[in-house]
Amino acid sequence: LTTTSQNAHYLRFFSQDADINLTSLYANPAGSAFLNKGWHISASAMTAMQSRNITATNPAYLLNADGLTSANGTRTFEGDVFAPVIPSFDFAYVQDKWSVSAHFGVVAGGGTCEFENGISPLESLVAGLAYTNGLPGYTLDSYMKGKQNYFGLQVGGTYKILDNLSAYVGVRGVLASCAYN
């Protein structure tokens, strides 16, 4: 799944680098100094659906007896993704000239993709073995399921230097959680 949006509000406003808003903390954390004094909390979630089609051409695919290969040796491997909830959370505490803030969310990935008929690199290995050994054909029961979630955490502080200038110091980390079957 391809999602690098940081939060659901990004889908409505792509230029978050220049936005002064709580939901822009990931892209513009220094902007938190210009929010109203007090606590600011945001929780958002989005749902994502996506299809991935991999088209590969290999003359050896013609040996596969399943009938899914075109006359020129091209096969399409179709994968579907559904991520019901991709969350993000933003917090800021703002005073006169300073603020502290944090962001947590799924910053990339966010879903599980299933390829019911496998993927081209796996098929190419078997097809290549059948072809180089002169076999009349092959069958392959292949399946691939991959999950990728990249959780981002950012914590830091902002100081308002001038009425229209602030500086941010913080740390950002990403934890990858990936699995393939």
What are these regions (language model features)?
Residues L1-I20, P84-N181:
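Outer-membrane beta-barrel porins/channels
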Residues L1-V106:
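N-terminal, post-signal peptide beta-strand-biased segments of exported outer-membrane/organellar beta-barrel
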